[in-house]
Structures are given as C-alpha cells and as structure tokens.
Amino acid sequence: MQTGKQSVTFSNPVYITHAASVVGSKEGQGPLGNQFDLVVKDDMLHQDSWEEAESAFQKKAVDIVMEKANTNPALIDLLLAGDLLGQSIASSFGTADFPVPHIGLYGACSTCGLTLLNGASWIAGGHAKKVICVTSSHFASAEKEFRFPLAYGNQRPESSTWTVTGSGAFLLSGKPDKIANISSNKSNSNKQTSSISADKCNSIKNVRN
C-alpha cells in the first residue's frame, strides 16, 4: 500500500532472516572489522582478474547466508544481484553456479537497498517465499571502471574515496526466523552470527514519506 508519495507499506510483512558479509583485508582492518563473517587476506581470492575476484566474493557471501539459514538453492525462489561493473558481470558470473532464477539490478551505491526493496515486493505480493539479495564491489575493479586503473600508477591520498572490496547477502522470507546470537567479538575463524529473535523482527518498509 502506498503511504505518501515515496513510501510503501506491505500488508504482508517481510523479514531479513539471515545476512552474510565477506570483505577484503583493508576492510577487516577498519572499525567494523570484527562484524564481518569472513575477512580474506587475498583480495584476488586466487582469481586471474579483479572482476573474477568480485564474482568470487559474491559467491562466498551467498554460500555463507545459505549455510546460516541451513537451506539450499532448491528452496530459494529468486536471487536478486547487483554490482558496479558494466553489464553487471560480477553478479552474472558470481551467481552462475546457483540454479535459481536471477534478476540483475543496477543502482550504483543504492544497489543493496534496491535488491531488498524488490525482493520484499516479490514476497509481499505472494510471488515468492524466499529471496536472496546480494551485492558487491571491488576496489580494483571500481578503479578500473570509474577512476584510474591501478596500472596507471596514479597517486592518491589516504583521504580519497576508497570503494569497498566485499559482498553482502541477505535472505528474505515472509516468515520470521531466529538467529543464533549477537556477538561483538571476532572469532579466530572471522565468522560472526548476528540476528534478532523472531518476535522482534520488523517488516521491511520504506518509512520515508
């Protein structure tokens, strides 16, 4: 139901039941380092190109969110994915191994919110029961696409914009679920679970009027 000029309220609530994050080494060194599920040391993830590495980040994020939910692709109705690259190639190849209908979305820095809004609409409308939303970026591939390719050797101050190397994935459902716990300490495996009890899950809604 439309609320105001820019907001939508769903009659059927939609929940983020699980979330996963995979980031590069620089992100792991920042103030949020202990909040990520996986911090990798090799930003290339043993791939041959930055674009392939970004795809690998997406795949890992989706794998982790499904592992947290104890589910598999057969139980997922739709996968919404997006990235910063031309033709969304990171998403196309990153999700290629998942036998799930895939819709690619592009919203630059708003891609995460865009996938969540669209995924929630599918569920609230009764067209899907479980939807995975995933987005990614990679510092090196973004530099190549929008700024100065690393091979150019451009000098950059530490205060300049730095695109995240990482990926985030969410599992949406029309039914709430419980997550194991909320922790503030990074484990040795760099894995972290965070969730909220089912009775406190709020439906996804755009509250801006």
Where are the predicted features?
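Short acidic/polar capping segments at secondary-structure boundaries
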Residues: 136-140, 145-147, 176-177
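Active-site-proximal alpha-helical scaffold in enzymes
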Residues: 106-133, 172
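A short acidic, glycine/proline-enriched capping/turn motif at secondary-structure boundaries
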Residues: 85-87, 109-111, 138-140
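Short, conserved acidic/polar surface loops in the N-terminal third of protein domains
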Residues: 88-94, 114-116, 142-146
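Short acidic, glycine/proline-enriched helix-loop-strand junctions
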Residues: 99-102, 143-156
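A generic local secondary-structure boundary/capping motif
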Residues: 3-6, 120-123, 155-161
